[in-house]
Amino acid sequence: MFTGIVEEVGTIKSINRGQHSAVLTVRAKTVLEETRIGDSIAVNGICLTVRQLFPDGFAADVMHETLNRSALAQLTVGSAVNLERAMPANGRFGGHIVAGHVDGVGRIANIRKDDTAIWYTIHADSAILRYVVEKGSITIDGISLTVAAVEPTGFSVSTIPHTICQTNLHQRHKGDFVNLETDVVGKYIEKLIQPEAPKQNTLTKEMLLRCGF
């Protein structure tokens, strides 16, 4: 589990693409502390497992499903990526519950500056927007942000200067694609309140005859 508080901005060092998967090598420093092979690191909000460690970074596998559902396929060598290690049991919960399982991709439709804040308008599919609520939490490229407004085709967030400086948002432009993960709490609530499908009766005449009735 993650919190959406980015620890470091890393750089894509290499991308080895296969037919249905890829291996990312990321140049990093802070997230290497106490990290072992097999640990999880969120890369632009996507939970990846460390397969190799180097003095200046790490390598991780990216599977077919992740490439299809996320914006990782658009990364190139030199791309800046937000990094966060999995939250330790004794760590501070600074953001919100982030699983690292991206729901889909959004597109930056507009960027505007307002005093010290920068506003981002993100367009997304209706399947994602159904879980986006005003004043609720959403993860954009691994960054925990608060939804300021929701529209039929997207939503807006406001970012403070600290967030801009500590993440890769300052390198984002209109038209860029970003990874989106909605608040998992809403998904669980929806699942719990959905009526269950009626169970089929498996008792048949043949079964009764076999049992001696």
For each predicted feature, which ranges?
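Conserved loop->alpha-helix
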Residues: 1-213
